[in-house]
A protein has these predicted regions:
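Active-site groove signature of glycoside hydrolases
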Residues: 281-297
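Secondary-structure transition/capping motifs at alpha-helix termini
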Residues: 157-160, 251-256, 284-289
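Secreted/periplasmic carbohydrate-active enzymes, especially glycoside hydrolases
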Residues: 1-232, 240, 251
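Alpha-helical scaffolding within the catalytic cores
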Residues: 179-186, 242-244, 273-286
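Structural recognition of the beta-strand scaffold that forms the well-ordered cores
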Residues: 196-199, 231-234, 255-258, 292-296
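Aromatic-lined substrate-binding rim segments of carbohydrate-active enzymes
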Residues: 221-275
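Acidic/aromatic-lined carbohydrate-recognition and catalytic surfaces
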Residues: 138-147, 255-257, 262-265, 284
């Protein structure tokens, strides 16, 4: 089956004695080789514990019409869903802990336990997370871009040994849209405030996919901010952008209009390629608070 976007392979069985350490990979392509054929992105070898965090989704909820540059904000809420997998063949119990911190202040933290059978996957959900006087994230020109540090830890319930942990910076914001009944056009709101979208187009940082560093991303995304733009449309014919791109957009207050691959030319023989690509893309960056619109190319 064709694979687009990220690719992860479990290698525990294959790298165990006496199996071969060679991995033949065949790329079937019915058209000429293009710039993203083959391995171009980073490759990782991950050593896991008895269990691991597969992915997670943090969803802030900011009600009402908020005012930027205000020191006292009404409380916000959030939900967090964490996918956990037991990698052992036996039943085990695990503790899932998360903390949400702004600078040195802990905004929220909770712990819950889960018991999984051997090889089982399940999701842990934290609902109604209260965030007092939240520091709200705003698009460029409309306000500031404060970020919270979200940390998730997975430990063995018996030994309390750390099995896995993940962290990322997240923004507290609410994005919505509707159709203007007078003009028939779509209008966007951030934290209840209507936003005039001023956007640019992003084909890619480098056609040869070299030097995809945070510094370079910040340089070019920063140019968009200096021009007063607050949105970038990521062209669907490019690559699945690296995390550094979204980090730069976080920093400069740039919303992202994310297009999907293979939506303009669907001649493949496989089933429902657009739906599969949509799922893979959203799993890659499920917590990017600046992603405000998905679309086909």
């Amino acid at each position: 089956m064709p694979i687009y976007g990220g690719l992860g392979l479990g290698t525990t069985h294959e790298v165990s004695f006496p199996f071969s350490l060679l991995f033949p990979i065949v790329v079937l392509k019915h058209i000429n080789r293009d710039r993203s054929t083959g391995i171009w992105d980073k490759i990782y070898i991950v050593n896991t514990g008895a269990a691991k965090i597969n992915n997670y989704h943090f969803q802030p909820m900011v009600g009402g019409i908020r005012t930027p540059f205000t020191s006292n904000q009404p409380d916000a809420t959030a939900s967090l869903q964490v996918s956990v997998e037991n990698l052992k063949s036996s039943t085990n119990s695990f503790d899932v802990y998360f903390s949400l911190t702004y600078q040195t202040t802990v905004a929220a933290q909770f712990t819950t336990s889960i018991t999984l059978n051997g090889g089982e996957k399940s999701k842990v959900t934290f609902n109604n997370i209260q965030i007092t006087n939240p520091k709200l994230w705003w698009p460029n020109v409309y306000g500031e871009q404060p970020l919270y540090n979200l940390t998730i830890s997975l430990t063995d319930s018996t030994s309390q040994s750390l099995l896995d942990s993940q962290s990322m910076m997240v923004g507290i914001r609410n994005i919505s849209s509707n159709i203007d009944p007078e003009t028939g056009g779509r209008q966007f709101f951030v934290n209840g405030q209507r936003i005039f979208v001023r956007g640019g187009n992003w084909i890619g940082l480098d056609a040869m996919m070299r030097n995809l560093t945070l510094k370079n991303y910040e340089t070019y995304v920063g140019m968009h901010a200096e021009m007063g733009l607050n949105m970038i449309r990521v062209w669907g014919g490019g690559i699945t952008e690296r995390p550094e791109f979204y980090e730069a957009c976080d920093k400069f207050g740039i919303l992202v209009w994310q297009e999907f691959w293979i939506t303009g030319d669907c001649n493949g023989a496989w089933d429902d390629p657009v739906k599969k690509e949509s799922q893979n893309r959203r799993k890659s960056y499920p917590n990017s608070h600046l992603l405000f619109q998905y679309s086909a190319q």
